[in-house]
């Protein structure tokens, strides 16, 4: 048994999720995957009801219902998210509560692509989910195979419209319900789907292999030694002797060298993604570093004022605004560890944004911040969260 456990840890880990229109079978498919893999000893079977009764979680001040399911294939370990309601999907994808490396787009062959099919594809594109595998569900309910071909063509065209390789994306046809009920042919289809996901969705670059980035939370001076910036390492690794840049909130970038590293008041050889560390910076005085800046590997991230964001605006019930807002609205954008005021410009044809909407708009920040496509932020007004977003495009 001990050997088996060791083996499981060496499998690469991938985050995926089911997306698609309501009632097209996302949760049924999730349940079917766990059932079929459980028969091979690679998962715990979870029934529809237990997945559908997704627990509430809070992510950046927003309540989201999400079911987290784990399973393995021969090659990999997967964490799979499934959300019961459409609003939960939108919030999940925008807040990054569940960062997906790839997605299974579920489309019912009986309906073809529907409004939320399109919306989920757009969201996946905006938040940086680069790989999609399609599961055409309920094919047992369509008598004419030509109709299924037609639906597949529509789905491929829709994916191409949002810059996915629609012609090349794998499409698997089947019935999640039949697989869940134990139909041997459909169980084979589920295995085929999992093999396809293993092959098509690449293993993500591990957080520790990405360039070093640490948002600064606190700054203090150690007499006789210098200035220490502390925070949680977002990605990458850092060690004594590394060159770093101090970036954000001011027009100039300061270069420094790491001369000391501490965690829990003990010295540390190497800090890595997830660690809360204090970084001693050579030749930097207390006034040159502040909360809200980042320490980063030189050249890995730039300062920007203008960006396009994909944003979910909280409802009144979620503690958000009670009224709509218009272009030139000036809230604070909380990036990394600090608030920066920004001016919002709504897209043509969008008069106003209501609480509960998700929307793409342009932002012009009054101070430059170290951001890139995929950086998460919250929108705040007087300290309370009114929205959550992700940078979908840099504009300057």
UniProtKB/Swiss-Prot annotation:
Residues 137-140 are annotated as: G4. The keyword Cell inner membrane does not apply. Residues 175-177 are annotated as: G5. Residues 82-85 are annotated as: G3. It is an enzyme of class 3 (hydrolase). The keyword Cell membrane does not apply. InterPro entries: EF-Tu_GTP-bd, EF-Tu_GTPase, EFTu-like_2, EFTU_2, G_TR_CS, P-loop_NTPase, Small_GTP-bd, T_Tr_GTP-bd_dom. It catalyses: GTP + H2O = GDP + phosphate + H(+). GTP hydrolase that promotes the GTP-dependent binding of aminoacyl-tRNA to the A-site of ribosomes during protein biosynthesis. Belongs to the TRAFAC class translation factor GTPase superfamily. Classic translation factor GTPase family. EF-Tu/EF-1A subfamily. This is Elongation factor Tu. It comes from Lacticaseibacillus paracasei (strain ATCC 334 / BCRC 17002 / CCUG 31169 / CIP 107868 / KCTC 3260 / NRRL B-441) (Lactobacillus paracasei). The lineage of its organism: Bacteria, Bacillati, Bacillota, Bacilli, Lactobacillales. The gene is tuf.
């Amino acid at each position: 048994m001990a050997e088996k456990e060791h083996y499981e840890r060496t499998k690469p880990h991938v985050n995926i999720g089911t997306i698609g229109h309501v009632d097209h079978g996302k949760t049924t498919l999730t349940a079917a995957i766990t059932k079929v893999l459980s028969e091979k000893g690679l998962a715990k079977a979870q029934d529809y009801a237990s997945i559908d009764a997704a627990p509430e979680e809070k992510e950046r001040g927003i309540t989201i219902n999400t079911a987290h399911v784990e399973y393995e294939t021969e090659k990999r370990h997967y964490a799979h998210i499934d959300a019961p309601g459409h609003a939960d999907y939108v919030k999940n994808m925008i807040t990054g509560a569940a960062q997906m490396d790839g997605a299974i787009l579920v489309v019912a062959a009986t309906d073809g692509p529907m409004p939320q099919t399109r919306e989920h594809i757009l969201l996946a594109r905006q938040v940086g989910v680069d790989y999609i595998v399609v599961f055409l569900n309920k094919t047992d309910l369509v008598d004419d195979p030509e109709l299924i071909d037609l639906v597949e063509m529509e789905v491929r065209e829709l994916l191409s419209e949002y810059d996915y390789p629609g012609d090349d994306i794998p499409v698997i046809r089947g019935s999640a319900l039949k697989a869940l009920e134990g139909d041997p042919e459909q169980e084979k289809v589920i295995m085929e789907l999992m093999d396809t996901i293993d092959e098509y969705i690449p293993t993500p670059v591990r957080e520790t292999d990405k360039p070093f980035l640490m948002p600064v939370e606190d700054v203090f001076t150690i007499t006789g030694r210098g200035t220490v910036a502390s925070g949680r390492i977002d990605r990458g690794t850092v060690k004594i002797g590394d060159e770093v840049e101090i970036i954000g909130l001011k027009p100039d970038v300061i270069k420094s060298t790491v001369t000391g590293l501490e965690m829990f008041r003990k010295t540390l050889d190497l800090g890595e993604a997830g660690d809360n560390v204090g970084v001693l910076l050579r030749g930097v005085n207390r006034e040159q570093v502040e909360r809200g800046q980042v320490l980063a590997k030189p050249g890995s991230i730039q300062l920007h004022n203008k960006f396009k964001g994909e944003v979910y605006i909280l409802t009144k019930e979620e503690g958000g605004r009670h009224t709509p807002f218009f272009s030139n609205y000036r809230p604070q954008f909380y990036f990394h560890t600090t608030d920066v005021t920004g001016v919002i410009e709504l897209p043509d044809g969008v008069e106003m944004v209501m609480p509960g909407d998700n929307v793409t708009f342009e932002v012009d920040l009054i101070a430059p911040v170290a951001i890139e496509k995929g950086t998460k932020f919250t929108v705040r007004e007087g300290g309370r969260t009114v929205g959550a977003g992700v940078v979908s495009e840099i504009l300057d």
